[in-house]
């Protein structure tokens, strides 16, 4: 039974400008060198490299960002945090010592957006500055960025009280 579910994608215009900017440069180089047969740049790479970069960055990067999403689910047993297609993490509710919905500074506190941090202090975020900080029983902290932070914190607290009260 899922008590709370939220799915977020990168929707910032500047992220997509960078993604499509990199892709456009790769497409331009590919068309110049492979399709038109004109070496691209002052010191052009071999054709196989143009093919590789075109597939990775001209096609792969936009597809990757299209499918990249942060999914958060709260169930009676655990909190699931998935940064598809990169990683997923399951945090048992019994390991959560403290829950706090708060405003944070993604760049200052965690170095930006995405999957960030260290083994003791991890953040999963996509956009904005609202999130839920979990303090685990071993002292580690996990920040989950959310567009519905208060609702997420309430769902976690409710599940902890209802299903894990002593």
PLM regions: where:
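A residue-level signal for beta-strand positions that form part of recognition/binding surfaces
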Residues: 1, 71, 131
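N-terminal membrane-targeting/pre-transmembrane regions
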Residues: 1-45, 123, 149, 166
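Non-transmembrane, membrane-adjacent beta-strand/coil modules in membrane-associated proteins
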Residues: 10, 81-147
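Short N-terminal helix-initiation segments at or just after the protein's N-terminus
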Residues: 14-19, 39-45, 72-86, 141, ...
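Loop-to-helix transition at the N-terminal end of transmembrane alpha-helices
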Residues: 42-60
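Conserved beta-hairpin
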Residues: 55-100
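Cytosol-/stroma-facing membrane-proximal "stalk/adaptor" domains immediately downstream
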Residues: 146-166
């Amino acid at each position: 039974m899922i008590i709370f579910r939220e799915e977020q994608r990168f929707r910032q215009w500047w992220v997509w400008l960078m993604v499509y900017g990199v892709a456009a440069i790769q497409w331009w180089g590919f068309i110049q060198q492979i399709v038109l047969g004109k070496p691209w740049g002052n010191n052009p790479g071999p054709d196989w490299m143009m093919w590789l970069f075109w597939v990775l960055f001209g096609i792969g990067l936009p597809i990757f960002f299209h499918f990249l999403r942060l999914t958060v689910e709260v169930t009676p047993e655990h909190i699931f945090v998935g940064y598809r297609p990169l990683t997923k993490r399951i945090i048992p509710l019994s390991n959560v010592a403290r829950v706090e919905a708060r405003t944070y500074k993604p760049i200052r506190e965690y170095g930006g957006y995405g999957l960030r941090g260290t083994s003791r202090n991890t953040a999963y975020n996509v956009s904005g500055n609202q999130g839920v900080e979990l303090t685990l029983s071993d002292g580690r902290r996990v920040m989950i960025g959310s567009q519905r932070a208060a609702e997420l914190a309430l769902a976690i607290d409710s599940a902890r009280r209802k299903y894990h009260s002593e």
